[in-house]
Amino acid sequence: MERFDVDAFKVFDKQWALVSAGTPEDYNTMTISWGGLGTLWSRPVATVYVKPIRYTYEYLEKNEYFTVSFFPEEYKMDLGVLGSKSGRDGDKVALTGLHAVKAENSVTFREASATLLCKKIYWQDLDPAQMPAEVIDTYYKTEAAHRMYIGEVVGIIR
């Protein structure tokens, strides 16, 4: 696999990314600012976190593959739109300058500078019983905890 060099502590939190699942004809995507890159079971992996109330959750549940796409700074406003609108309410991608394209077994965007094609190898709901009280107060007072998806990175699209 080719090399993928990023600042792992900034690429999600400061730059943001899109997690997407489905096909270019039937998919959903959402902006994420929580995630991780690493190694699990001697495989390169990407980890993302999605709440069950999000429309993208449904697509992650029914698809074996997902993508994590990174963008140049000029698309940050588009990512802001995709993080604040729901695909349940209409074609939110049409409100942006992004264009969905096929990514082998999933979907990405023509404008992405890099996309990780991921095969789901593990998922688990985060357990509030194992969280500090201030995390629950800040993130989970009124909504269910995130589901963690770990995907083996099976390809990098540039």
Residues covered by each model-derived region:
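Active-site-proximal mixed secondary-structure blocks
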Residues: 1-32, 36-158
